[in-house]
Amino acid sequence: MWLILFMIVIGAVIGGVTNSLAIKMLFRPYSEKRIGRFRLPFTPGLIPKRHDELATQLGRMVVSYLVTSVGIGKKLTEASFTDSVTEWAKRESRKFLSSDQSLSSILHQNFQVEDSEKLVLQQVERWLETSYDRWFREANSRTIGMALPEVIVEKVERNLPAIRRMLLTKARDYVASDQGKAQLSVMIDRFLETHGTLGNMVSMFFSNERLVDKLHPELLKFLNDQETEKWLQKLLDNEWERLKEKPLADIQQYVEKEAVVRIGRQVLQTQVPVIQWLGKPLHAWTGPYEEKVAEEWVPKLVHVTIQLLVSQLDHMLERLHLEEIVREQVSAFSVERLEELVLSISRKEFKMITYLGALLGGGIGLVQSLIILLIK
């Protein structure tokens, strides 16, 4: 009986100590041990020995199975996540738009801009100068007709008959008026004075008043003639076609860069409210837009941003080099800290493994003692 009990105790001790030692040898010793030139077996422990390999494998596992573009994309497009981000963005936008700060102070605090109005004007002037140079540089191979929007070309051509009618109406009204008749008399006098002998001969036979009385009805008749309308319409059409065929570069001499920049600056200062908004509190001028921004623009912006992120996830994760980050972090993690972490999580399980070893050892001791008794 004592033999059986002794063998059970010895087996249990051996089994428990063996399993406990095996668990310890997962982490210890932390470094290689030597006696002279000879390295002791099983040093360092399993995890310290495979630390770098473990870091590499963890990096691969994280990239391949844990942090993937598919998983992140699925999370980003979940309705709950999208709704929470949208609500947060709405709150922040309302908070920003109702702020007492001005655009000038925000630019100064966040971007160290001392004179925001001067900066805006400088940027607009630079943009106008660049656009002017680029537009006329590209104009070398283009005509006015090519540069004009099609809607403008169509509108001009559609209104040419109206322009013709307006010109003829104005001309008829002017010629038929007393002012027009007086101007005709002046023109006849000027004509006779500048044509020497011919003018003197005409003056001998016809007085100025008589010439006006003769020419005035004929001029009105000419202006009311349908052929005159056709002639004027053809003239307008031809001039319009000639204008469209002119190179864009031809108009550069009439449009100076300095004038364009000056007019743009004046319009910005007097007509565009941004300049006036710069020094005012945000809530003073954003009130009419707050609801539209928060309820319409922000949700659309959130949706577009999330879709853009999802479409670029593969590229972003590749550029982040997550595998390398995980490998470096795990490699930098001390084995002592790793041991504490694993034991804090699995201490109960490791104890059960030790007890299981003792139980198996005790069972083996019992079997051995019974075999010995049978042999005797």
UniProtKB/Swiss-Prot annotation:
One of its GO terms (cellular component) is plasma membrane. It comes from the Bacteria. The chain crosses the membrane at residues 3-23, 355-375. Keywords: Cell membrane, Membrane, Transmembrane, Transmembrane helix. Pfam families: DUF445. InterPro entries: DUF445 (IPR007383), UCP032178 (IPR016991). It is found in: Cell membrane. Its main location: membrane. It is a multi-pass membrane protein. Belongs to the UPF0754 family. This is UPF0754 membrane protein BH1148. The lineage of its organism: Bacteria, Bacillati, Bacillota, Bacilli, Bacillales.
